[in-house]
Curated annotation (Swiss-Prot):
Organism (species): Prochlorococcus marinus (strain MIT 9301)
GO cellular component terms given for this protein: photosystem II reaction center; plasma membrane-derived thylakoid membrane
Residue ranges annotated as propeptide in the record: 1-9
Membrane topology: Single-pass membrane protein
Family: Belongs to the PsbK family.
Name the UniProt record assigns to this protein: Photosystem II reaction center protein K
Stretches of the chain forming a coiled coil according to its record: none
Cited HAMAP family: PSII_PsbK
SUPFAM superfamilies noted in UniProt: Photosystem II reaction center protein K, PsbK
Length: 46
């Protein structure tokens, strides 16, 4: 099963230049999640 996931984890050759961007993409929802807490702290958790 691990071999199957490893096969899909590699980007095609044409997209190798975008590898650093693709590595950061999963973190974007986490930034929004943290932004919710910062926003609520700013308005006093109403």
């Amino acid at each position: 099963m691990l071999i199957l996931f490893n096969t899909f984890a590699e980007l095609p050759e044409a997209y190798k230049a975008f590898a650093p961007t693709v590595d950061v993409l999963p973190l974007i929802p986490l930034f929004f999640f943290l932004l919710v807490f910062v926003w609520q702290a700013a308005v006093g958790f109403k």
